């Protein structure tokens, strides 16, 4: 795919110079162009005060278990705040800087992040210093909900049991990054799984009194199939 194919001169300025108009993939093109420059700026102008890797998550759903798995010394950020629709999210220039400065970028995948997913999936090839992982794509597809057209439902966190599998993948990924004690990581993981088990039991306790014939959920978005 030629990412520059849609960056073309469309019109002329008053002085007769070409005015360049960006098409569908401007952020990806700019990201690839600016990667070496921004990485260099980071190294020369912003020396790190910590030897711990910088971990960037697209959503709070991923960031929360990552923070529980890691000691507080680790730098964990997420891009999208509460109430943001990840399908429609458009990264800002500051987001792009954070992505390029991160040692590890974690995102859902399965196009939950919309067109941002395409940018992230190609980032690793253009910026070898940044590791990018679509964490939910590591779950076997036979465990996922797939509609007749072959589209995968990406809202895995609404099934607590399935989200435990995602957390296991997070643990495996984090094991490969940073100076982290395997014993401490395993202990934190076990605590996280206990919390998720308690949450799952609380959900069952809340739903069990509802008769099967009355378990109907009316929602404005098709995000609750796993629930």
Roles of regions detected by a PLM:
Residues 4-27:
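Bacterial N-terminal signal peptides that target proteins for export
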Residues 17-19, 31-32, 115:
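Enrichment for repetitive, rod-forming helical segments
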Residues 26-39:
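Bacterial N-terminal signal peptides
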Residues 37-227:
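Extracytoplasmic metal-acquisition and chelation regions
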């Amino acid at each position: 795919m030629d990412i520059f194919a849609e960056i073309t001169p469309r019109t002329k300025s008053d002085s007769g110079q070409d005015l360049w108009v960006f098409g569908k993939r401007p952020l990806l093109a700019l990201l690839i162009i600016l990667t070496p420059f921004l990485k260099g700026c980071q190294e020369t102008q912003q020396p790190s005060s910590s030897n711990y890797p910088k971990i960037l998550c697209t959503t709070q759903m991923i960031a929360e278990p990552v923070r529980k798995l890691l000691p507080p010394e680790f730098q964990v950020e997420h891009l999208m705040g509460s109430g943001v629709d990840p399908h429609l999210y458009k990264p800002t220039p500051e987001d792009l800087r954070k992505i390029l400065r991160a040692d590890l970028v974690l995102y859902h995948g399965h196009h939950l992040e919309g067109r941002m997913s395409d940018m992230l999936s190609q980032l690793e090839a253009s910026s070898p210093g940044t590791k990018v992982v679509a964490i939910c794509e590591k779950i076997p597809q036979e465990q996922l909900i797939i509609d007749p057209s072959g589209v995968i439902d990406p809202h895995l966190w609404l099934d607590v049991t399935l989200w435990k599998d995602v957390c296991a993948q997070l643990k495996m990924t984090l094991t490969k990054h940073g100076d982290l004690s395997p014993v401490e990581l395993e202990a934190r993981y076990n605590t996280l799984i206990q919390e998720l088990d308690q949450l799952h039991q609380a959900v069952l306790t809340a739903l069990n009194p509802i008769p099967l014939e009355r378990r109907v959920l009316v929602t404005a978005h098709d995000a609750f199939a796993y629930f």
